[in-house]
């Protein structure tokens, strides 16, 4: 789910920037910053988890939500930059935790299989993202370039609520 939500940056940002008459050439730079931000938390992930504790996933989702919001409401193309960075940082923190929780949950003999399923889900999100977005645009009768960011922001907010409500459960206990 998180993979699907953040894919709006890579799949839809150039179209949003073009619709707002921004330089679509700068979208490549912004997408590069997004991927750089995904990588960056890996250098200090243990410290981040120690600092944020059982609210790590909640704060990661908050970063994604604020980033999507900044991208959506941006009156200038350079306000999109912190949005891309926040989405990337949030994803860069939560994605390794998903793999870690998968290893903790699986029985030792099935760890590789469990990780393979997580990877399959990520690749399915990448494959299906455009179709899911198009389907919901059709349902809501909109062709807006902002729609993927608004829709994914709503999904992220609902997931944040779930993460907050269940922060003491095994799934969210880091």
Residues covered by each model-derived region:
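Helix-to-loop junctions at the C-terminal end of transmembrane segments
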Residues: 40-53, 137
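Structural signature of the two symmetry-related core transmembrane helices
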Residues: 55-70
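A membrane-interface helix-boundary motif in multi-pass transporters
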Residues: 133-155
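Multi-pass alpha-helical transporter architecture, strongest
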Residues: 147-174
